[in-house]
Amino acid sequence: MNTPKLIIILAVLSIGLSASLAAETNTDSATPSCCSTSLPAGEFTDKSLYQVESTWTTDQGKHIKLGELAGKPQVVAMFFANCQYVCPVTVHDMQRIEAALAPELRARVGFTLVSFDSKNDSPAALAEFRLTRALPKERWTLLHGESDDVLELAALLGVKYKEDANGQFAHSTVITVLNAQGEIVRQQIGLGQDIKETVQTLEKLVGK
């Protein structure tokens, strides 16, 4: 982890995981405001997730840092490809958000899925998932990471997860909107939620 703050976050996540999964509720949670002052390329605020130095692999086999997603808003969720119920609904919710944007705005928003399953969700497995779900390459990014990096990112996103003995994951369902600098500006918690406010947030971010 890169800072004492991250270490504290991860400790809290570990202690509270089981209770938090049991108590999760399906409500929307929004963080204030969205539009930050533009920064020079490669520089991020202290609230930006793009400060994380970990390296990820896309389903196309490209190695990237999260900062390479900067420049336009991102709709981000964590999942695993073998998930039979929750994750497909989460992806569908993201597709609902995508479809609700006007075509000219849709092209200015990215959609990112990050796998919990470092062991099984190889780039090839993620590429197959993309084909199965018909996720356009020009807008959607699918990421595989090492287990420690996944844990760090999950903590920063407020996503709680735990692998069971069968290789399945119990996890919270959170769709996060990041602004162009990688700051969290909205989180939609739970499945099948009303997407209106999330769409409005994205419209503001891209300057409708």
Predicted features along the sequence, with ranges:
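Structural micro-motif
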Residues: R139-W140, L151, L157-E163, A170-I175
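Short loop/turn microsegments at loop-to-beta-strand junctions
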Residues: Q51-V52, Q74, S172-V174
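Short active-site neighborhood of thiol/selenol oxidoreductases, capturing the structured segment around
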Residues: L66-M94
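Structural microenvironment flanking redox-active thiols in thiol-disulfide oxidoreductases
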Residues: V91-L153
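Solvent-exposed coil/turn segments that connect beta secondary-structure elements
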Residues: L69-G71, F80-A81, V114-K119, L135, ...
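Thiol-/selenol-based redox modules, centered on thioredoxin-like
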Residues: D164-K208
